[in-house]
């Protein structure tokens, strides 16, 4: 769990974790990422607990904090928790029961989105086997720890969680969802989702896509039809984020780079998904205006 400037939430988050009632033993690895507020002071009351370890480091961002924690894995499975969120009662028990019963590489639980005392929505899943098309959010899941044996979160980028969507989920052979609602997600107006709007750093969404496609090659991972469809979704997400930058020149450059990526990695692939065909056709035809229209149409139909 990365900790940075969360003095308002850290106690609620930690209490929700250490109070989990479960037959499964677990270790809470907290990485104080150079937090300048009172977060570290508030963590002191947990230092004596046998299943809590606190690591202090200079600030390296969310990715750097998670990578530090991953180097200290001792268990068979790992879970990521953001320190302004919290676990639901019974989360560890429900996720781990499913993981062990079905020998899963990843188990995804449901989540509740909230702000203050108000619930904004809830995402629920069936008890079922799943494929690797889960959205690339790190929380609300347990992962087999060995999935991160050769993989880490890219540091220095926004949207570093894309590594899950484009690499980690692809490494998993068995994924299941559970109907248990495991996670409370706080809608944070200070997070990247909101602060990225209009910020040139939004371009990281494109940069990290190229970086991760290169990393896939280094890991010996080939291209597949399923990955191609995910890639098209990723291009949509990239443009959705970057459109907040008020520069047509930037948009056109991103379109051209997207064409190059598709040509480099997926030249001979074609999608069978109706919702992605207009986007694909614009990349093949080099029509930026049609690309813009395709992105706008997807915006209303794809989460």
Task: Report each predicted region and the residues it spans.
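Membrane-interface aromatic/basic loop that binds lipid-linked glycans or pyrophosphate carriers
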Residues: 245-303
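Catalytic core of nucleotide-sugar-dependent glycosyltransferases
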Residues: 182-188, 195-224, 235-241, 245-269
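Nucleotide-sugar donor-binding/catalytic module of glycosyltransferases
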Residues: 1-211, 218
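Structural motif
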Residues: 218-230, 278-286
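Short amphipathic coiled-coil heptad-repeat segments
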Residues: 114, 233-234
